[in-house]
């Protein structure tokens, strides 16, 4: 009897979130984003925590912070992917770099250059590189003084795009 009641409560909660998510400022929209997030597997603990913090920022209307944290999760994912072959392809594509660790990569090269390197090693194509550079631009607008004040919808869209990009990059072998 209790199991049945709990099942009905969970079904009610899911249905309520689906119906409320159509309203522009409804917190239920974050729950829908959680569904996208659950599709991702293979994230590091750090990436997972960064994305969770990003969602918490949305819940607390800290939209610029949410942009920054979700980008940070994506670039960490990219750095880890570049490191997956011990930087062999990266050092071949960028012979002057001589990267030996993720820390070395972070300390010596910009995120813009890292995204360009993803194209050079065959992880992404030119149009995908432009998309990632666009995400970086949004992150920079959020992190530095600017007239960029994202709202709830823009932030959820950005995080959704980041999650979709991670999911896409997870499927890529390069």
Regions found by a protein language model. Name each.
Residues 1-11, 121-174:
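Charge-enriched, short contiguous segments at helix-coil
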Residues 6, 10-13, 17, 37:
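Residue-level detector of alpha-helical secondary structure
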Residues 11, 22-123, 127-130, 134, ...:
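Amphipathic alpha-helical interface elements
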């Amino acid at each position: 009897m209790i199991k049945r009641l709990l099942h009905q409560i969970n079904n009610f909660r899911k249905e309520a979130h689906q119906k409320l998510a159509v309203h522009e400022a409804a917190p239920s929209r974050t729950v829908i984003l959680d569904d996208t997030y659950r599709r991702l597997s293979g994230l590091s603990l750090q990436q997972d925590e960064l994305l969770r913090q990003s969602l918490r920022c949305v819940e607390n209307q800290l939209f610029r912070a949410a942009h920054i944290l979700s980008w940070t999760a994506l670039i960490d994912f990219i750095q880890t992917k570049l490191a997956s072959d011990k930087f062999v392809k990266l050092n071949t594509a960028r012979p002057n770099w001589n990267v030996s660790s993720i820390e070395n990569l972070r300390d010596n090269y910009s995120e813009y250059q890292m995204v360009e390197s993803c194209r050079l090693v065959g992880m992404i194509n030119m149009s995908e590189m432009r998309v990632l550079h666009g995400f970086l631009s949004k992150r920079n607008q959020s992190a530095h003084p600017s007239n960029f004040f994202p709202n709830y919808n823009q932030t959820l869209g950005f995080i959704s795009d980041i999650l979709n990009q991670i999911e896409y990059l997870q499927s890529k072998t390069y």
